[in-house]
Regions:
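Polybasic, low-complexity RNA-engagement segments
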Residues: 2-16, 21-24, 34, 54-110, ...
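A short acidic, Gly/Pro-enriched loop at the edge of an enzyme's catalytic core
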Residues: 167, 233-243
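Conserved class I S-adenosyl-L-methionine
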Residues: 169-176
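Conserved SAM-binding loop of SAM-dependent methyltransferases across substrates and taxa
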Residues: 179-192
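Helix-to-beta-strand junctions that scaffold the AdoMet/dcAdoMet cofactor pocket
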Residues: 191, 287-289
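S-adenosyl-L-methionine
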Residues: 201-235
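Mobile active-site "lid"/loop adjacent to the S-adenosyl-L-methionine
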Residues: 204, 241-281, 298-305, 326-328
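Class I S-adenosyl-L-methionine
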Residues: 239, 292-295, 300-415, 422
């Protein structure tokens, strides 16, 4: 039988079908959406290096390709701004990078940057870059990317993490975190204090999330792959700040990634609304009194945005909206002026929505007093591991030594954030990919430091370093996994020493000295391709 629908319109699902099946079915649907099997869209699209590379020079979507029902909805939503919105499809999309302030300041970046960049007005550490400028190469193919100095991210996608009022020492949950653009910013703002708990229900996406957090040098992490209701079972009222960057229909990304329109025709807003509301319900359970919850999407749909917020406010009288700044072309929420909407005809970025909620209560949880850091001398470890850890010269946040409890599990050493000890039975009930900073691995009495540790260190915190300028061809050789030759004056360390390889003062990974060579120990899964 022929499909009688108009060309360009979206296939309608059974409205409310997911809602009727309850949270359990919503979780199953969310899992499939997160893994892309239903063409599901995550707000962080354009947030990983791979996506950014793919879309750097993409032609974008033409307005005439938009589904008819979507165009009609936007005409009603925007009124006299509708034509300006359509005209934005004729303009180029914008590429962005966000400086990792865990490793350097915006001022340091401005002095160091090899790229032509312009600041993103609403993000202090956000910059636009021109993908067609081949003079300094692509940011995704520069040693500084491998050093974790910045994260490639669509400019509007930088907004949610920036709006959540995180401060050092907080316990922060990013509940739909992969691939990690927002988590890496949240971690940088914690400054290594408190706890960053990053979760994604898709195990494969959670692995990419872990890599990006390690590359950014965030030490105080827990990374899990769990359903939200499982997290809330073990972590009630545990977090100071929560980010819900929810799966959505992706209407705000049509201009940048036309392929999303096909997914939209199969699965639209009515399929995502019950999923979003189920996630938010679990998030509220994990928020402490006085804590903040930031909800964001990359869609324009009212039910997915203001409708979901209204749903939560009606069911939770102790939750209230906080006003977000309406600067730089940000629009107010529809019927909720406290929220913000980002439109591509108003800003140099794609479509986004954000709302900040606060839970009533005094909210100040007691801070742990037993935050003394461990030094290598106090640990019961094999001699080689003890000797290596004793070499570390860590002095951060008023402490000296490792910033947490060191534990051994299956031959691997981890430095656990102090707040991890307050999770009670969560360690046995939640599927963790990582708890704390992986220090290294014990192999038949030998100790091999981890790639994650290298990225979390500063050059001055380890005594044996080989520091090459970014233009030195040996940097690329190292990133490709090759042996690196040293000049006589560069090889002053004892043979067999673990050497921290750096570029312009920023760590890349480990090598072992063998004569006038550095035997490559760069993690194979991260190598330059």
């Amino acid at each position: 039988m022929k499909d009688s629908r108009k060309k360009g319109s979206r296939k309608k699902g059974k409205k409310g079908s997911l809602e009727a099946k309850g949270l359990k079915e919503s979780r199953s649907e969310e899992s499939r959406l997160a893994q892309g099997s239903l063409g599901g869209v995550r707000p962080e699209t354009g947030d990983s290096a791979e996506t950014e590379i793919r879309t750097e020079n993409a032609p974008g979507c033409r307005a005439e390709l938009l589904p008819e029902d979507f165009r009609e909805k936007m005409r009603k939503l925007l009124g006299k701004e509708y034509e300006a919105y359509l005209e934005s499809f004729e303009k180029p999309c914008h590429n962005g990078l966000r400086v990792n302030t865990m490793k350097l300041s915006e001022e340091d970046w401005n002095r160091l940057s090899p790229f032509q960049t312009e600041p993103v007005p609403w993000i202090e550490n956000g910059f636009y870059y021109n993908a067609s400028d081949e003079g300094s190469g692509r940011p995704s193919r520069h040693p500084y990317y491998y050093a974790g100095l910045y994260y490639l991210q669509e400019p509007s996608a930088m907004t949610p993490a920036n709006l959540l009022p995180v401060k050092p020492g907080d316990r922060v949950l990013d509940i739909c975190a992969a691939p990690g653009g927002k988590s890496t910013e949240l971690g940088a703002r914690l400054r290594g204090e408190g706890l960053l708990f990053s979760n994604d229900i898709s195990n494969s996406r959670a692995k990419a999330l872990l890599k990006n957090l390690e590359m950014a040098g965030i030490p105080n992490i827990c990374v899990s792959s769990e359903a939200p209701e499982k997290l809330s079972e073990f972590l009630p009222e545990f977090f100071d700040c929560i980010l819900v960057d929810a799966p959505c229909s992706g209407e705000g990304m049509f201009r940048r990634e036309p392929d999303m329109i096909k997914s939209y025709r199969e699965r639209g807003p009515e399929d995502y609304v019950p999923i979003q509301r189920a996630i938010m319900e679990e998030a509220v359970k994990m928020l402490r009194p006085g804590g903040y919850l930031l909800y964001s999407t990359c869609t324009f749909d009212r039910e997915e945005n203001e409708g979901t917020i209204r749903y939560i406010l009606d069911r939770h009288p102790d939750m209230s909206l906080c006003s977000l700044p309406h600067r730089f072309g940000f629009a107010e929420g529809i019927g909720m002026p406290e929220c913000v909407r980002l439109f591509p005809h108003r800003i140099e970025g794609e479509g986004h929505f954000a709302a900040l909620l606060r839970r009533a209560g005094s909210g100040e949880r007691p801070r742990r007093k037993d935050r003394t850091a461990q030094s290598g001398a106090s640990l019961k470890l094999p001699d080689e591991a003890l000797a290596f850890l004793s070499c570390l010269n860590l002095r951060r946040g008023g402490t000296e030594g490792l910033p947490g409890q060191v534990e051994e599990k299956n031959g691997k050493l981890y430095c656990l954030p102090p707040d991890f000890q307050d999770m009670k039975g969560a360690g046995k009930g939640i599927r963790f990919l990582r708890t704390g900073l992986l220090l290294g691995e014990l192999k038949r009495g030998r100790f091999e430091p981890s790639q994650a540790l290298a990225m979390a260190l500063r050059k001055e915190e380890y005594p044996f370093t080989a520091d090459f300028q970014a233009e030195d061809e040996r940097v690329i050789r190292y990133l490709k996994g090759e042996t690196v030759a040293l000049r006589e004056e560069e090889a002053s360390w004892p043979d067999g020493s673990w050497v921290l390889v750096c570029t312009d003062g920023f760590p890349l990974g480990w090598a072992k000295k063998a004569g006038l060579n550095l035997k490559n120990k760069y993690y194979p899964g991260w190598r330059w391709q």
